[in-house]
Amino acid sequence: MDLKKAALDYHLFPKPGKLSVESSKPCLTQQDLSLAYTPGVAEPVKEIHKDPSNAYKYTNKGNLIAVITNGTAVLGLGNMGALASKPVMEGKAVLFKRFADIDVFDIEINAKTSDEFIQTVVNIAPTFGGINLEDIAAPECFYIEKELKKKLDIPVFHDDQHGTAVVVAAGLINALEIQSKKLEEVKIVFLGAGAAGCSCARLLKSMGARNIIMVDRQGVLDKNRSNLHEINIDLAIEPSAIKTLDDAMQDADVFIGVSAA
């Protein structure tokens, strides 16, 4: 069976999708139902109204994450739109549940602007204990994350930035140890200067890396480039003869590929 058919069958059978919602309490008797819904449900409502922190006692808020996207940077596929990104968001939800027993709602937002996206997330945030931003294109992803962290009182995590950066840093630490090399002495070349690339490079710099060259589809990021934004301008090198990926790879110790294609 080829990969395409196997993947489509996996998502289609025995029922469409990868997620379902199940009750965590017994719902077999009339008494159970009267506690799960009216009239019994009024009691936790009143307790939460008196003290909002009680939501963590009487609801699933503390173990419920929203995996949220606008579908503008889906895997290596690019801007696929909100609806087409749903299988990826369901897949991330499965990982949360399988490896951490964290419950997830996947949410795909059609938003014309970053501010519209932000306001939508702010409006639904009371439901959740945390927000996982996923597959949002750079540079808008940086603005969205920054604004949500300012506006919300729950954790906001952008997986493509911070998740990727942590994994890359861990792998590189081990690889350098095997090679008996030091982070501050190696030359590191990134292909890709979007959300993942910038976040990885910034983390490695904070850990002591001194020689990092970023390359995107237009070549090496240097300070003569006129199209840099606030997130990658601090990663640009001084103008030099290094202009292409081939130039950058001369005597490189580490290559990290985080480009869209």
What residue spans do the PLM features occupy?
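N-terminal ligand-binding/catalytic initiation module
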Residues: 1-156
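Short beta->alpha junction loops/turns
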Residues: 26, 110, 137, 161, ...
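Glycine-rich, charged/polar anion/phosphate-binding loops
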Residues: 49-54, 199-200, 240-242, 261
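Glycine-rich phosphate/diphosphate-binding loop of Rossmann-like nucleotide-binding domains
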Residues: 75, 82-100, 158, 162, ...
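Short, well-ordered coil/turn residues at beta-beta hairpins
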Residues: 134, 257-258
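Rossmann-fold NAD(P) dinucleotide-binding segment
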Residues: 144-151, 242-251, 261
